Amino acid sequence: MKGSKEIKLTQMVTASGUAAKIGPEDLAKALVGLPKMFDERLLVGFDTSDDAAVYRLDDDKALIQTLDFFTPMVDDPYLFGQIAASNSLSDVYAMVGKPIVAMNIVCFPSCHDMSILGEILKGGADKVIESGAILVGGHTVDDKEPKYGLSVAGLVHPDKVLANSGARPGDALILTKPIGTGIVSTGMKAAMVQKSTEDEVVKIMAHLNKYAAEALDGFNVNSVTDITGFGFLGHAAEMAKGSGVTLEISSKDIPIMSEAEELAKMGIIPAGMYRNKKFIQSDVLCEGVSEHIMDILYDPQTSGGLLVSVPQEHARALADKMTSCGSLAAKIVGRVLSKEEKSIIVI
């Protein structure tokens, strides 16, 4: 690992990664009074809680705009920078776009060694370079708790935008990364996980969704979203509601990180899981699935994978291509049904 400073970034914050986000119920209350924005050039706004905004520039180009930042979930500054940048870039990939420019968003306590911040920025810059985008500046705030992320702009052809609202009955669902980052990160903070598991979760969180998104080219994909702070079921529910369908999730096919099940059984769970569960569970039908597995499905993810809705007949070929392109999981985890009483059915 890079970053030799002996510092416990995770001990400087009350919540880590995407688990630090405001819960979906409280966020919905805050957003209820905002005016709706209408513009014929705005292809994707916040009406369906999508991953990024998309604005048509001309017949051949649309601008993707997004930002994301959060608190540390690992102690190594360089790795924190990599993970935060990967998470920020993911929203562009979820719209099947190409990131072009990025700007740093930094909150950092000025009483600490600035070389620590330098390592965070270096980790972020390396991921921006890997993405093919250009880092062009940023903004800083002196804050008690460190936070880092990016504002990212990307490009996509207006006719090729994939939102979270296009899933169709008969589609299969593919997930491209294992889940459980919130639970495992909580275990890491308490020094309750093995070193091999720490290395695994860091690798997963730092992995760009670029490679999974590039594999979509040539397939008739209907909908995409990325799995982050509202957990697998939270983002799946947004896709279901936006598309007017029900998603049936096969719990046994969900890829889960090492030690996540054991930690969940012990109750080593971030507060964000409970917020997600409270907000979503009334729209979820659970059929004989154990409580600890459901907790993992509600677990807030940091830099999670893509959830892709694709016609059933193309699903296996797409999953195989994703794997060959470098995806960490690419598992078929469910299917899309016509609208039923609940948005999500877990079997």
Swiss-Prot record:
It catalyses: hydrogenselenide + ATP + H2O = selenophosphate + AMP + phosphate + 2 H(+). One of its GO terms (cellular component) is cytoplasm. Keywords: ATP-binding, Kinase, Magnesium, Metal-binding, Nucleotide-binding, Selenium, Selenocysteine, Transferase. It is an enzyme of class 2 (transferase). Its cofactor is Mg(2+). InterPro entries: PurM-like_C_dom (IPR010918), PurM-like_C_sf (IPR036676), PurM-like_N (IPR016188), PurM-like_N_sf (IPR036921), SelD_I (IPR023061), SPS/SelD (IPR004536). The active site is at 18. Mg(2+) binds at residues 51, 91, 226. GO terms for molecular function: ATP binding; magnesium ion binding; selenide, water dikinase activity. One of its GO terms (biological process) is selenocysteine biosynthetic process. The record marks 21 as: Important for catalytic activity. CDD domains: SelD. ATP binds at residues 21, 48-50, 68, 91, 138-140. Binds 1 Mg(2+) ion per monomer. Its EC number is 2.7.9.3. Synthesizes selenophosphate from selenide and ATP. Homodimer. Belongs to the selenophosphate synthase 1 family. Class I subfamily. This is Selenide, water dikinase 2.
